[in-house]
Amino acid sequence: QSLLLFFLFISFTASSSIDENEKFLSFLEKEWQWELAQNPVYATAMGVKGFETQWPDNSLKGIKLREAHIQDSFVELKKFDPNSLNKTNQLNLRLYTQLTQTALSISEYNRYLFPFNHRGGVQLAHEAVESLPLNTAEDYRFWIERLKNLDKRIERTISVARLGLEKNYKAPRVLMERVYRQIKIQSKQNIEDNPFYKVFKELPSTIPLEEQKALRKDARKTIKEEIIPSYKLLEDFFK
């Protein structure tokens, strides 16, 4: 998916006065905006405003809507005549069509029913902050607000995982044991040792001390009342 985002980003450098080229570039721009909406953490990392408190919609409905969008995009791609595009956009069309076909092929395997991976997943959500700009008090407030919405993502993950089990989609036990250990780290009651609190231990000196205290207080409250209970639910699900 990151390859798709990168492709869309660099594609906007192409331009043409020919109608077909303009239509194609307009299509790519719409796809780019859609991708940003689907990947709000990435959007924030790219400096795009308006997604600062959001997580990807990992609900079953959200997943199905994405699959439908990719299918619709593939249909739209087929409408473009390569011979009416300049050489740059001919290449862009081939590449984006190939990426879309690959996404469609992958969706046939229902990989979303395996929502856990020891190298990524909701149990490692704290790692998202590594790609985000954290320079001002506002940046930290946005991150706290995003954390307050993490419970919904965890609940949706459990719901999708439960559906996967009902359909007999099971990941290797050895991998899930690693995931379980990662979850237990998040559900520990010691806030100071919680992975989500690490980023608040040393705040930029440009943030006034009183504001630093307020940010840490809000972070501890959020971790205690929102993060730890949500991961405890996830831990119980794994049991």
PLM regions with names:
Residues 7-16:
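Hydrophobic h-region of N-terminal signal peptides that target proteins for export
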Residues 15-239:
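N-terminal maturation segment of proteins
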